[in-house]
């Protein structure tokens, strides 16, 4: 099959629509279930590149959760501790495979954004991973293969309409890629840049120490950014992205957006949140939404009399601003990557509030000295990668 007709393009009025190979070769995919759409395939192919590179860079199984051509989360398959298992809603599942841990992390970092995601997996989808996917609201999954039982689990999702795509892991795209905008053809070389520890050698701060665990987190953040709509920054910790700021025109707005997501990830681990008692039968999405509101500024929307009874068995206490700040002050060792240079030190001021200790960015701003000085003020270690990672 060298082309596949789609229902429509980005929007229902954009017809006809298809994906195809310009050279007449076979498509490197098989649709095993469902009928993926135009945006599904954009998410799938971007996500597949991301997890393929994460696996190559770390040697660990990788997963990503994509929405509208940017990742909501990305991770490698490190084991989950009890707290992370609980906030990712997999504490009832024992001895998860590394791939399942990777997806639990990718989906769980920003559950609000990951709702209705398209999943990419670096390895053959196993039963553990399929069972996590089974109970989440998701549009589809792409992987290099599926265990027979895992495939049956996924095929049963959405009354048999769940999108399952198998991709040829050995497929290598052409070195030149093209696209059209307004009838005009753009052509460029593919971004074949390899992201590894060699990019982290130029440490420009007083603090020169970047431990191996932080190097892995920085690599995860940079590979994630390579497939995130620009401008973008990514906070990472413990083998996963914990806050991704995508598609902002202002660098500091990226840093704030991603920092707020990282804060929410950590606030969900606070005792005040872990102790919430939800009513029986509450939907996962409603539970996620309630937590998101509870840890935010509009907490009374879920604590008001006549409202909390629909969500909680027992009325929770207010999680005060002072309590939240005290909890966030414990977050440390976070890695931060950026797809382009930080123009001002205010980005580092904001990053420090979310526990950032390690930074990787291209450098090249006329105010690099100011950014370095701000990092030194907080004891951060920052590497200049000298590479830009714009993605559009």
What does each model-found stretch correspond to?
Residues 72-111, 242-342:
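Glycine- and Gly-Pro-enriched alpha-helical subdomains that act as flexible
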Residues 117, 121-122, 135-165, 170-172, ...:
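C-terminal binding/interaction regions
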Residues 57-65, 164-167, 230-237, 267-278, ...:
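Flexible, glycine/charged-enriched surface loops at secondary-structure junctions
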Residues 175-210, 268-285:
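Substrate-contacting helices/loops that form the catalytic groove of nucleic-acid
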Residues 53, 227, 264-268, 353, ...:
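Conserved helix-loop functional segments at active or binding sites
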């Amino acid at each position: 099959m060298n082309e596949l007709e789609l229902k429509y393009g980005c929007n229902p009025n954009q017809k006809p629509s298809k994906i195809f190979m310009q050279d007449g070769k076979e498509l490197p995919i098989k649709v095993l279930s469902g009928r993926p759409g135009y945006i599904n395939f954009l998410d799938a192919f971007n996500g597949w590149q991301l997890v393929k590179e994460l696996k190559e860079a770390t040697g660990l199984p990788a997963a990503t959760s994509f929405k509208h051509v940017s990742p909501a989360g990305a991770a490698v398959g490190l084991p989950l501790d009890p707290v992370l298992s609980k906030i990712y809603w997999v504490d009832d599942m024992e001895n998860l495979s590394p791939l399942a841990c990777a997806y639990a992390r990718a989906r769980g970092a920003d559950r609000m954004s990951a709702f209705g995601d398209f999943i990419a997996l670096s390895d053959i989808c196993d039963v553990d991973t399929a069972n996590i996917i089974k109970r989440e609201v998701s549009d589809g999954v792409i992987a290099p293969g599926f265990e027979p039982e895992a495939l049956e689990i996924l095929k049963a999702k959405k009354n048999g309409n769940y999108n399952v795509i198998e991709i040829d892991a050995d497929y290598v795209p052409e070195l030149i890629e093209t696209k059209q905008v307004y009838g005009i053809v753009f052509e460029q070389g593919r971004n074949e840049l390899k992201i590894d520890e060699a990019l982290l050698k130029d440490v420009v701060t007083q603090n020169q120490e970047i431990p191996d665990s932080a190097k892995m987190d920085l690599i995860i953040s940079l590979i994630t950014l390579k497939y995130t709509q620009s401008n973008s920054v990514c906070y990472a910790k413990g083998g996963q992205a914990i806050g991704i700021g995508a598609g902002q025109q202002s660098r500091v707005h990226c840093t704030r957006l991603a920092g707020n997501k990282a804060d929410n990830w950590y606030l969900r681990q606070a005792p005040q949140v872990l102790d919430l008692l939800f009513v029986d039968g509450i939907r996962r999405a409603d539970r996620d939404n309630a937590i998101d509101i509870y840890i935010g500024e509009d907490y009374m929307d879920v604590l008001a009399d006549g409202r909390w009874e629909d969500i909680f068995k027992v009325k929770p206490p207010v999680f005060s601003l002072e309590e939240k700040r005290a909890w966030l002050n414990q977050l440390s060792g976070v890695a931060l990557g950026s797809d382009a240079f930080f123009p001002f030190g205010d980005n580092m001021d904001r990053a420090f509030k979310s526990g950032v200790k390690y930074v990787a960015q291209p450098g090249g701003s006329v105010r690099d000295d100011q950014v370095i000085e701000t990092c030194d003020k907080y004891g951060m270690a920052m590497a200049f990668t000298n590479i830009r990672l714009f993605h559009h």
